[in-house]
Amino acid sequence: MIYLDNGATSFHKPQNVRRAMVEAMARCANPGRGGYPAAMEAANTVFRCREEAGKFFGCDPEQVVFTSNCTHGLNIAIHTLVKPGGKVAVSGFEHNAVTRPLHGLGAEIKVAGRKLFDWDNTLQEFDEALSSGADAAVFTHVSNVFGYILPVEEMARMCRDRGVPFILDAAQSAGMLPVSLPDLGAEFIAMPGHKGLLGPQGTGILLCGRLPEPLMAGGTGSESIRQEMPDFLPDRAEAGTLNVPGIAGLWAGMRYLRRVGIINILKAEQRQARRCAEGLQKLGMQVFFGEHQAGTVSFVPGMDCEGAAEILARRGIAVRAGLHCAPFAHESAGTLETGTVRVSFGHDADDRQTQVFLQAAAKLPVRSL
């Protein structure tokens, strides 16, 4: 199988990730619930990953909260910062993991920057959204649909200058682009463990620049006499038993990235994305590709996108088609009615993947514009 759906989850995990998970299941009990060797091994496994994440993202280990996925972390962050009916500035490329929690809070959503790959438009409209009285901001680092890398450093500076607290959705950038909690000055940065960080499904990280409000309450192994959640990190946001085998795999994924280098992986992904986009353009497809591009390409063939993905799947190629849980992004790009076929490269991106994909894509009909 040629796997080109890394925007959904990384696949073909590194061997050390799988080994770490198997070892954890063989050696670890429950962390923070006992002083016997298997419990201590579990606690050490969790702390080791917390330390690695702190190094990776430039923060203290205590600021690293483990979640079940990026959506979980975003919900914690949004319910901490956004009050019911509050005004929130977002980009024009947000995932439903951002917009649905905001909708549930009855927030007034101010959408900024609807032009693909246009930093000037993004920054101008984001500045206008902040100036119109935004109480908070939430924005993605990279569009999950189009691979558009947003100018988050400048957006973060605008928020800091106006005293607007903000959340960064690093679902498509963690493990692929540099992300630093102190450099950005974010209140929270949410990310999955199973995408660019190469960990397993069911893992995620929330970097906390402030104390979050608990989304769940329960046992933490600390301050058990109290009926309130602890008022310190990370315990305040980690109720219940942690996913220790998953956290072990996440640690191994970050170690792999540190050894290989995220810049090297990004360059390989971007190179294949460009080759893919150029090849699709030669075939006559409608392709979305621009200057500020990660390792993802979206295109519209001359047929139903889901049908095109099924044809590719029968040829052993895994891509994703449809709206990708991001209707705001499709509205911005004018593809809300059609959706797109998304090709997203991963840490093992190479020429063969692109070549085989383009050979199969050549069998798809071309859209008449």
Regions found by a protein language model. Name each.
Residues 1-369:
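Pyridoxal 5′-phosphate
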